[in-house]
Amino acid sequence: MVVEVLRLGHRWGRDKRISTHVALTSRALGADKILFVSNDDHVKDSVNRIVEQWGGDFKFDVVDSWKQYIWSFKKNNGIVIHLTMYGENINEIMKKIIEKRQEGKDSKNILIIIGAEKVPKEAYELADYNVSVGNQPHSEVAAIAILLDRLFEGSSLYKEYPDAKIKVNPSDRYKSVEIR
């Protein structure tokens, strides 16, 4: 299963920090790629620097048409999840999503849509699932973290990358970092 995150509405200059955090959280919790509808070299460079130091093959990409990308993704039997505070409760829909993902011979790829500003109506219509992580305003970073943790059932929290140049050794008393 491949998990991609599509960031809609990134506002260049205004959303650099939060979009970087969405990307890094996506990577840390198991996603394979983040897609933007416009390029932001600051975000791209930050993501690539983290991957270089901390390992893995997480990708940053830009799509010309987000609608076309979603259509193509769905055509290839992928599942599209839109994170929105107006969607179905994650506690009630997650089991159904996991079952759908495992349906058939191969597990299905997943595309998660996450907005920065008001998300166009078409995103709601194109999504297979409109999912809420609570019905109160909060950070999209929190929403993507919770969804990915539920999707991977906690297995991505302590994932190790063999090509990492930096590795944290958990400790209850002090910082322990291994530089390779």
Curated annotation (Swiss-Prot):
GO terms for biological process: tRNA nucleoside ribose methylation. One of its GO terms (molecular function) is tRNA (cytidine(56)-2'-O)-methyltransferase activity. S-adenosyl-L-methionine binds at residues 83, 115-119, 133-140. Its EC number is 2.1.1.206. Gene3D superfamilies: 3.40.1280.10. Keywords: Cytoplasm, Methyltransferase, S-adenosyl-L-methionine, Transferase, tRNA processing. Its main location: cytoplasm. One of its GO terms (cellular component) is cytoplasm. CDD domains: aTrm56-like (cd18083). It comes from the Archaea. It catalyses: cytidine(56) in tRNA + S-adenosyl-L-methionine = 2'-O-methylcytidine(56) in tRNA + S-adenosyl-L-homocysteine + H(+). Pfam families: Trm56. It is found in: Cytoplasm. InterPro entries: Alpha/beta_knot_MTases, tRNA_m1G_MTases_N, tRNA_mtfrase_aTrm56. Homodimer. Specifically catalyzes the AdoMet-dependent 2'-O-ribose methylation of cytidine at position 56 in tRNAs. Belongs to the aTrm56 family. NCBIfam families: PRK03958.1. This is tRNA (cytidine(56)-2'-O)-methyltransferase.
